[in-house]
Curated annotation (Swiss-Prot):
Quaternary assembly: Interacts with HDAC7 and KAT5.
Protein name: Endothelin-1 receptor
Positions annotated as glycosylated: 29, 62
Top-level taxonomic group: Eukaryota
GO cellular component, one term: plasma membrane
UniProt xrefs under PROSITE patterns: G_PROTEIN_RECEP_F1_1, G_PROTEIN_RECEP_F1_2
GO molecular function: endothelin receptor activity
Pfam families: 7tm_1
Annotated source species: Bos taurus (Bovine)
Disulphide linkage map: 158-239
Membrane-spanning residues: 81-102, 113-132, 160-181, 206-229, 257-278, 307-328, 348-372
Cytoplasmic side: 103-112, 182-205, 279-306, 373-427
Modified residues (Phosphoserine): 425
Subcellular location: Cell membrane
Gene: EDNRA
Length: 427
């Protein structure tokens, strides 16, 4: 029975690696040096498993055959199609959800403010990843090879794929940090009522976020190359991280810790710090006539702060399993341990689950906003189900100030638009 579960978790994790096959997958990130492609002894794989020397998935650094893990692996077509359905679902939900979120913010002038601009920036980063990277994942899973592997366009995709993946994560992380800082600024200046429009400082922040995210993803574009190999008598090429310089060797060696520290811990620490400061600010100013006069205004800002906090929590839940499996692999796994196969199967299964959860993060933010905030829920319903509203009176929305959208007739909206410019919208 133990052998059965060992085999099951092992091939499940291998499919997970093929699904993502990005900078986060074990097929390109388990070891220090990437210079070979191997297949597992006694297996019947419909795809190529890329491994590394001296530390590949099952073969120790001495390369002896008797040190292979004993499990046999076989991938069923049904399992591949199940994962294809999951990827397609994420693609559809992510594309529709993030595109709708961008449309809502773009079409409503009253929503063009600092916090909404950061949320739109986050959604755009997720949308780019969903539209470009996920189709490549599905193709690799079904075809069992890298797309356009024999021509220059395949090389371009090999550079673009990990670059966009890492850029998307960087955009998400830095936007969450910026939103936490923005919420603290909003509470610290609670007597100031923010108007409509994107502040210059927020525009600079967004541009800086994208530039920095692209810069930090450059090592991925440099390190990933098309590596030729022979499999079952046929010549193939696959996209792998191949460290050919001292800098890339250093990057590959510290990559797991760098990803864990910057792309996971930093937004959590930033949120913890600024939300603690925000709480202290609210407690220190809990009394006062001005606060009483602006109690509704402060309530609106607290609701927005809760929404941002929810996005950070979802990010942590989606990415924690993947980072945990990488850190455990780095610190606990010993390739020379005779009992390593049981631990390896557990880590691979955790990695597979983590990869899918991390991918889900690119489509789950619009869903979270739909359920957490009534204002977003009403906006999504209005935008996605506009045909259902055509028989009703022409309706438009006022700024998203409270926990729900207040709908006004077209004539009333003209009167309220000018007043709304002095309120703090969602935000």
């Amino acid at each position: 029975m133990e052998t059965f579960w060992l085999r099951l978790s092992f091939w499940v994790a291998l499919v997970g690696g093929v699904i993502s096959d990005n900078p986060e997958s074990y097929s390109t990130n388990l070891s220090i040096h990437v210079d070979s492609v191997a297949t597992f002894h006694g297996t019947e794989l419909s795809f190529v498993v890329t491994t590394h020397q001296p530390t590949n998935l099952a073969l120790p650094s001495n390369g002896s055959m008797h040190n292979y893990c004993p499990q046999q692996t076989k991938i069923t077509s049904a399992f591949k199609y199940i994962n294809t359905v999951i990827s397609c679902t994420i693609f559809i939900v992510g594309m529709v959800g993030n595109a709708t979120l961008l449309r809502i913010i773009y079409q409503n002038k009253c929503m063009r403010n600092g916090p909404n601009a950061l949320i739109a920036s986050l959604a755009l980063g997720d949308l780019i990843y969903v539209v470009i990277d996920l189709p490549i994942n599905v193709f690799k899973l079904l075809a069992g090879r890298w797309p356009f592997e024999q021509n220059d366009f395949g090389v371009f995709l090999c550079k673009l794929f990990p670059f966009l993946q890492k850029s998307s994560v960087g955009i998400t992380v830095l936007n969450l940090c910026a939103l936490s800082v923005d919420r603290y600024r909003a509470v610290a200046s609670w007597s100031r009522v923010q108007g409509i429009g994107i502040p210059l400082v927020t525009a600079i922040e967004i541009v800086s976020i994208w530039i920095l995210s692209f810069i930090l993803a450059i090592p991925e574009a440099i390190g990933f190359v098309m590596v030729p190999f022979e499999y079952k008598g046929a010549q193939h090429r696959t996209c792998m991280l191949n460290a050919t310089s001292k800098f890339m060797e250093f990057y590959q060696d510290v990559k797991d810790w760098w990803l864990f520290g910057f792309y996971f811990c930093m937004p959590l620490v930033c949120t913890a710090i600024f939300y603690t400061l925000m709480t202290c600010e609210m407690l220190n100013r809990r009394n006062g006539s001005l606060r009483i006069a602006l109690s509704e205004h402060l309530k609106q800002r607290r609701e927005v702060a809760k929404t941002v906090f929810c996005l950070v929590v979802i990010f942590a839940l989606c990415w924690f399993p993947l980072h945990l499996s990488r850190i455990l692999k780095k610190t606990v796994y010993d390739e020379m341990d005779t009992n390593r196969c049981e631990l390896l199967s557990f880590l691979l299964l955790m990695d597979y689950i983590g990869i899918n959860l991390a991918t889900m993060n690119s489509c789950i933010n619009p869903i979270a906003l739909y359920f957490v905030s009534k204002k977003f829920k009403n906006c999504f319903q209005s935008c996605l189900c506009c045909c259902c509203y055509q028989s009703k009176s022409l309706m438009t929305s006022v700024p998203m100030n409270g926990t729900s959208i207040q709908w006004k007739n077209h004539e009333q909206n003209n009167h309220n638009t000018e007043r709304s410019s002095h309120k703090d919208s969602i935000n």
